[in-house]
């Protein structure tokens, strides 16, 4: 797996059978794949939905993505949204502003993907990937599909 010319070493630890996407009850999800303004558009959430589906989780969003009109407020995490505590929280294109972080900081594992190495989300992430989510997420999806068969 490579991103931006750098190699990313990945290993599938566990494959969770495709459980489909749940409704907007993100508080109950064990895996959340969240997108922020860095997703770039409503269509940008398509790959996040696919990753969430493969992991048996759900999607979520930052206030910025909701304000852009890319996703319903039902999926918003943070001070003006919902508080979540999943086992795994993917923060994709989310800067890590305090109002968002207060709603997800107690997640067991936080994985951040952002092009800005100084993004505050990396301060709380257990794992971080500095790279373009539009390259990293599709590569991760392919790894899961290849190793999950």
Describe these PLM feature segments.
Residues 1-149:
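N-terminal glycine-rich FAD/FM-binding segment characteristic of electron-transfer flavoproteins
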């Amino acid at each position: 797996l490579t991103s931006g010319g750098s190699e990313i070493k990945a290993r599938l630890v566990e494959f969770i059978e495709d459980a489909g996407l749940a409704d907007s009850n993100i508080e109950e999800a064990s895996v959340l794949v969240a997108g922020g303004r860095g997703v770039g558009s409503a269509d940008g959430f398509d790959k996040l939905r696919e990753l969430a589906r493969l992991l048996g989780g759900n999607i979520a969003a930052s206030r910025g993505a909701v304000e852009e009109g890319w996703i319903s407020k039902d999926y918003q995490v943070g001070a003006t949204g919902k508080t979540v505590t999943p086992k795994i929280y993917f923060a994709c294109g989310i800067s890590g502003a305090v109002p968002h972080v207060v709603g997800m900081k107690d997640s067991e594992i936080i994985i951040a993907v952002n092009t800005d190495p100084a993004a505050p989300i990396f301060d709380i992430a257990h794992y971080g990937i500095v790279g373009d989510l539009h390259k990293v997420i599709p590569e991760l999806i392919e790894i899961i599909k290849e190793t999950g068969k």
